[in-house]
Amino acid sequence: MHTSPMEQPGTGDAGGLNVYVVELSRQLAALGVEVEVFTRAVSSKLPTSAELAPGVTVRHVDAGPFEEIHREDLPAWLCAFTADVLRAEAGHEPGYFDVIHSHYWLSGQVALAVARRWGVPFVHTSHTLAKIKNGALAVGDRPEPPGRLLGEQEVIAGSTRLIASTADERGHLIDLYDADPDRVDVVAPGVDLETFRPGDPAQSRARLGLDRDGDLLLFVGRIQPLKAPDLLLHAAAELLRRDPTRRSRLTVAVVGGPSGSGLEQPDALVKLAADLGISDLVRFQPPAPQHELAHWYRAATAVVVPSHSESFGLVALEAQACGTPVVAAAVGGLRTAVADGVSGLLVAGRDPARYADTLDRLLRQPHWRSRLAAGAVGRAAGFGWSATARGVLRSYRHALSPAAVAV
């Protein structure tokens, strides 16, 4: 409800969830499942429906003004969204939909009401959990509101089945939300192995206008406190403090847009780079389509994912699929996405000096980087979207079985 699969990931509220819904829908359609995606219309110019891929239809629901609405204000439009979904179903024969799959707690609220009305099971994927986010808040982040905590609990309790991205998330659902262990399936997200694959770093650097021989540290994602791009800037400044000669060969690229804003260069990060004395090294880029993003990954010496929390971390998978080692926070799903010491390196804590230590070792040892790069490709190879779709389809079948827990 809060974002559309048609939007460009990396800005506003568009991120890994968008990629997940798009790729999962495509792969489910390839398995013979007819998919309809309901999302809120943010413009009066959008068609009522559009084909995302063969077998996948996106339906734009009228709920609220035709503009972006802050997530905290969206609960006021849940009833309108639900009513429009019910109207869409009324145009079909009874029993047209077999199962509902909701993504994020807001959509889960709609699914809960609609599933009861239609008498069909519903499967829910949280993507993020309020209790986990509130336990790992960044400076400048607002805690998730009580309404989300209550709504999320209701969705988790009322779903037919739950899909967790990792065993850790499954544990959180059981321990923090009292989810029935027998109703929670673990299905890892995937990566598009056709788009994100190894290539010639020199060609990618030439395409992007980057120095052929320098070191490139890359951040990809929404510019928000949770993702902590500021930590990368502090770590880069620490690298230069230790070795000023690095300045001539080091570039830090931040590819993404600020969450909830249309600005291409987030003012706070620009100011931080200036305050740290590294403005000349930092390159801000707007969100890039996937085919261009793959060039950024291939061009990078290392991709840095310093998030405070991640349910999985698709950026880490995409980078590894391109053969680039990842330096990531040892939190949440990143501990599953990245094989520490094999495909990348996990850093405990929030100290920029620790990141600088890790990056320093990586930059100084090209042979070690090469081993990690090979390990990265192997790690990502086990996470194709087709495997994700098969796992999700198994969850649907469990939900549809007579023994499924009633909604």
Swiss-Prot record:
Asked whether the UniProt record includes Zinc among its keywords, one would answer no
Q: What Gene3D superfamilies would the database entry show?
A: Glycogen Phosphorylase B (3.40.50.2000)
Per UniProt, what is one Pfam family of this protein? Glyco_trans_4_4
**Superkingdom field:** Bacteria
Q: Which GO terms describe its molecular function?
A: acetylglucosaminyltransferase activity; D-inositol-3-phosphate glycosyltransferase activity; magnesium ion binding
EC?
Answer: 2.4.1.250
Give the record's GO biological process terms: mycothiol biosynthetic process
Q: Keywords for this entry?
A: Glycosyltransferase, Magnesium, Metal-binding, Transferase
> Per UniProt, where does UDP-N-acetyl-alpha-D-glucosamine bind?
Q8, P9, G16, R222, K227, E310, E318
Which residues take part in binding 1D-myo-inositol 3-phosphate? H2, D13, A14, G15, G16, L17, N18, R71, Y104, T128, R148
This protein's assembly is summarised as: Homodimer.
Q: What is known about what this protein does?
A: Catalyzes the transfer of a N-acetyl-glucosamine moiety to 1D-myo-inositol 3-phosphate to produce 1D-myo-inositol 2-acetamido-2-deoxy-glucopyranoside 3-phosphate in the mycothiol biosynthesis pathway.
- What family does the Swiss-Prot or TrEMBL record give for this protein? Belongs to the glycosyltransferase group 1 family. MshA subfamily.
Protein name as it appears in the record: D-inositol 3-phosphate glycosyltransferase
